A protein has these predicted regions:
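Conserved SAM-binding strand-loop segment of SAM-dependent methyltransferases
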Residues: 75-81
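Conserved helicase motor core of SF1/SF2 NTP-dependent helicases
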Residues: 2-74, 85-304, 308-344
């Protein structure tokens, strides 16, 4: 998606028209164009100065921004993922843009502000999934809401209200997970209903559908080990893929090959066709030996995954569908009888 292809709605236009010489917080639901609005602001300041930076949490989201900025002749040196920023000399910038700011805590927000004269923070509290409990291997990581970041800075958050990514039909899955979002009511376009597929050969089913001519595919799973297993399986079937794990990445967002990434790494990204395998309880165990079932215990990250498709959402399971999702007979899914459900 080229940067100049973004046609802003009236809410986005307010942000775009604001002077960049201020510190601001912008909040918006999944699909409301936060990242693309950020890119517009970055493009604006890039015509004035090289002293700007974009901070994100994940390597995959960094790569998205790098690819987009390359289209306007900007180098990758303007974009940092979080650990990269922590290890850097932390240079000072005139403008700093932080995407998915709900992934950071008060101390980190203060650190960004200390190195940017004008700081812009974009985020959605409902997509806060980078908070981790401490373990013997890691000190953990705390986060704070977008609203708390606005209070910390002393500004009133600007709102992006319209969901441009999701169709009304696909939004109803995320809305089932988090009813308080009223996600489908923010959507303005219709499309195919989500497809619920029951199959004992889930990866073969995904390959079959991809071979039908799909060129903008995201395959989203919870564990990094699932990414590598699926990558190896697809490559053994002669299907080139792009992929990202915790410590390795081979991903080009301009490629038409399927992208295999984790739910966490998918945040901020979008694909025309999104496949989420292992939607049954404990089905992840065919790939990894960990004890946490993401379909039961990692619901915020699942919400993020279900809100990535531009057009088609495929939920695939083999046996017992996770109860956090609509039941198999739900009219939300393709092929089931419709009843009044949602805004239109």
């Amino acid at each position: 998606m080229a940067l100049d292809n973004l046609t802003p709605d009236r809410h986005q236009q307010i942000i775009i028209n604001m002077s960049a010489e201020r510190t601001a917080v912008v909040k918006g639901i999944a699909g409301s164009g936060k990242s693309l609005t950020l890119l517009k602001k970055a493009k604006q300041v890039s015509t004035l100065t090289n002293s700007y930076a974009i901070i994100v949490y994940t390597k995959s989201l960094k790569q998205f921004f790098v690819d987009e900025l390359a289209e306007i002749g900007q180098t990758k040196n303007h974009v940092f993922y979080f650990k990269e920023w922590q290890k850097s000399t932390k240079p000072n910038f005139k403008y700093m843009f932080v995407d998915e700011c709900q992934d950071f805590n008060a101390e980190e927000i203060a650190d960004f502000r200390a190195h940017g004269r004008y700081c812009w923070f974009f985020g959605d509290t409902n997509q806060s999934i980078m908070g981790f409990e401490p373990t013997i291997y890691s000190p953990g990581h705390t986060v704070q809401s977008v609203e708390d970041t606005a209070k910390q800075i002393g500004v009133h958050p600007q709102d992006l209200c319209i969901n441009h990514r999701l169709t009304i039909e696909n939004a109803k899955v995320g809305e089932m997970i988090y009813p308080q979002t009223r996600l489908s009511f923010a959507c303005i376009k219709h499309g195919p209903k989500p497809r619920l597929i029951k199959s004992v050969a889930q990866l073969d089913k995904i390959i079959e559908l991809i071979n039908g001519g799909l060129t903008d595919v995201g395959i989203l799973v919870y564990y990094n080990n699932q990414v590598t297993f699926i990558r190896d399986y697809f490559q053994s079937r002669g299907i080139p893929v792009q992929w990202k794990t915790y410590d390795e990445m081979d991903i080009d967002f301009k490629s038409t090959s399927p992208k295999i990434i984790t739910w966490h790494c998918a945040k901020g990204l979008q694909f025309n066709d999104v496949f989420i395998p292992c939607c049954g309880l404990n089905e992840y165990k065919q790939y990894v030996s960990f004890n946490i079932d993401p379909m039961a215990e990692k619901i915020p990250a699942l919400y993020v995954a279900t809100t990535r498709p531009l057009e088609n959402l495929y939920l695939i399971y083999s046996n017992k569908l996770a109860p956090v999702l609509p039941v198999a007979s739900s009219p939300i899914y393709s092929g089931n009888k419709s009843v009044a459900n949602g805004p239109f």
